Amino acid sequence: MIEFSVGMSSYGPLITGLIGLFFAFVLYGLIMRYPAGKSSVVKIGDQIHLGAKVFMFTEYKILAPVVIVLIVACGLSPLGWYTALAIGVGALSSAIAGFIGMYSATKANVRTATAAENSGKEQALSISFFGGSIMGLCVASMGLVGLGGLFFYFTQALTDVDQIAKSLEGFGVGASAVALFSRVGGGIYLSLIHISEPTRQDS
C-alpha cells in the first residue's frame, strides 16, 4: 500500500503547490504594474505597509517560543518527533503564507484606491480581487508543499501507515496554531487602531 501511494502521488502535491506559488507571484507582478498614485497616497500606503510588517514580525517573535515549546513537548510525548516535525513545518508554512498575504494586500490596497479614483470601480474591483486571491493561493500552495514534502519524507522513513497518518496530523496543528494566534492578535491590533484613531484626531 505504501509503494502504491508513493508511486502515484509522491511529487504531485509538491509540484502542484509550487505551481500555485508561481501563479501567486505572477498575480503580484501584475498588481505591481498598476500605478500607486499620488505621493500623498503612496506615503499613506507605505505607512500602512510598514505598520503591518512591524506588527507581524513582532507577533511572530512572540509566537516562535510558543511553537518551539509545542514542538519539544510533542517530541518528548508518545506522539514522537515525526509529529513534532510536522507541527514545525505546518507552523512555518502558515507563517510564510500569512506574511506573503499581508505584504501583497498592503501593496494592492493603495493601487485599488488609486484605480477607484482614476479608472472606476471595475478596475479597482479587479485589483482588490487579485490582491486578495494571492493569500488564498499561498495558503493552499504552502499546504500542498508542506504536506507533500512531509508525506514523501515519512513514506521513506516510516513503514507503518497509521504512524504516517498520525504524524501528518501535526501539520494541521502547527498551521492552525499560527493562524489562530495571528487572527486573534490581528483583531486586537485592529481594535486598538480604531480606539486610538479618535484620540489622535482630537489631539
Task: Tell where the protein language model's regions lie, with residue ranges.
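Loop-to-helix entry region at the N-terminal start of transmembrane alpha-helices
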Residues: 12-13, 167-174
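Juxtamembrane helix-boundary/capping and inter-helix hinge elements in multi-pass membrane proteins
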Residues: 36-39, 114-123
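Residue-level signature of catalytic and energy-coupling elements of molecular machines
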Residues: 48, 112, 194
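Helix-interface capping motifs at the ends of transmembrane segments in multi-pass membrane proteins
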Residues: 2-6, 72-85, 145-170
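Inner-leaflet juxtamembrane helices
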Residues: 100-113, 186-190
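Mid-bilayer segments of alpha-helical transmembrane spans in multi-pass integral membrane proteins
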Residues: 91-103, 136-144, 148, 175-184
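N-terminal alpha-helical transmembrane segments of multi-pass membrane transport
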Residues: 4-97, 101-105, 127-137
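Single conserved hydrophobic/aromatic residue that forms the stacking wall/gate
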Residues: 193, 198-203
